[in-house]
Amino acid sequence: KHLDYCWVISLYHTENTQVVHARNVVCTWKPILVFRKGRSGKIESCSGHAMVDSFRNDYRDKEFHEWGQGESAVKYLIETFSNPDELVLDPMAGGGTTLVVAKETKRKCIGIEIDPVYVEKIKANLMKSKSVSMF
């Protein structure tokens, strides 16, 4: 089965914004593309409430990756779009925040990262996480 496009969410950053040099634009938000498998029709969060398609990321956690997201933003997305025991996919895993939060919220997870340096950081972050059994 394939994934179906669901929506795009705007994640606004309150600090650490970047200038896109080629266009001379200060970028204050990041698009989060949401895809789903096996769900169609009306968009609802897994809690049954209406989904909010923009929210503020008050803290950008750059400890694990230079473009890292705070755990609270990742937790909001995971809990909005998945239930416990469902699968979460992060195709650009970076420092592994999504994988750690997915495990801590009882989700299965797959992370993809091509940079070997960050693959090792992900492994270390997963080992430090309090509720993670790895591999």
What kind of feature is each model-predicted range?
Residues 127-135:
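Class I S-adenosyl-L-methionine-dependent methyltransferase module
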Residues 1-112, 117-119:
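Core catalytic lobe of class I
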Residues 122:
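Conserved SAM-binding loop
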